[in-house]
Amino acid sequence: MPRPFFLFAPGAGAPSTHPWMQKWKGYLESIGEVALFDYDYMREGGKRPDPPPQLVAAHRSALAEIRKKSSGPIFLIGKSMGGRIGCHVALQEEVAGLICLGYPLCGGGDRTKLRDKVLRELQTPILFIQGTRDPLCPPDLLEEVRSQMKAPNSLHPVEDGDHSLRLTKRGLQAAGETQDDVDQRILAAINEFVGLTAFL
């Protein structure tokens, strides 16, 4: 049985070489093959993200390269913006599933600027990994959107987690845990999601 393949997209502010991305690449390699890529503006040294159609085109181009290499199920996983753009790609491309590491539901943290239209249009199974302290995705708003989605969707909440799924030192001490413990539970949730959806 072919191993799953993760196409791992970065967030707006940190390219694929960022330590956070590299850490999660290493974790994901325990489940399947992993390919990282960068959007055009990152490769060109820019700070401001490209217009959404250009981001989607770059993401689809990276996916096309993966299809040449993999016969297994392909999952689009992304940090923040990378997860959101992956959702747009899934409206145009067939993939096994979507995994969003900190979905940026509220544009700029503004509860009135919801990026929920694409979520409501999705048919592809999706897993949200979400910190409960993330100002870009308040838990109550995400639950409201999830309840109205057509796509099979699930949530792994990271209690006390921020937009990068990191806990405060106080939170870790109170729970008697390390960040690695938290990360391993996230990885287990991803592994379970992949197992349930890879060959649907």
Region roles according to the model:
Residues T17, P135-L141:
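Conserved alpha/beta-hydrolase "acid-adjacent" motif
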Residues E94-G109:
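A conserved short beta-strand
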Residues L7-G11, G102, Q130:
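The conserved beta1-alpha1 loop
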